């Protein structure tokens, strides 16, 4: 991105610009600092003109807000829409950036989780969003079923659509309710709600079988991670299987997935 704009922005302006952007379907999602607010249209037009599979350019307009983790976006250039179909790992996901939480940055992490699912497993994703884990696992694993839930009605509606879009209806049970209402016995349980995950640890231990595996996402610095692990162990007997760094959130703070087995 910086190379593209070398003739349009000053050296100090280029220094403020991030090197890359997220592409979600046909939408380019940029992070533009306030200092470059007056230059955002130039930046957006450059992206639109130079990336053939980009039809819309937006910028992140807020921090991730509320229990639904939605981060609003502002339209900058191209086709005026925030809805798109995102393709990753052999599946298609329809979504609206202003209505649901979605990040393409976890696509390799989702594959990692898929590769741990065994034949006959019951997999539960109680904060599933539009279904990136649930649909992927239903389509490419030999699990018995996937229980997919999200409290956000918009995310649930897209989840229902994505189950149909990927023809995995027979393998996914979809719900739109509070995760605390569940009492299932899953072999694999995905807890991808990093900001609030610690307040759902009791839900995780209740809904996973003995010897079942939990994928517990959290935000922490490397120094804070041992505290997060102590918090997990304080909620039930378990063994830590792995600690996977899934990208950075801010300087020194990372998204982690702590995989643990309930004992």
Residue ranges and their predicted role:
Residues 1-263:
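SAM-dependent transferase fold signal centered on methyltransferase-like domains
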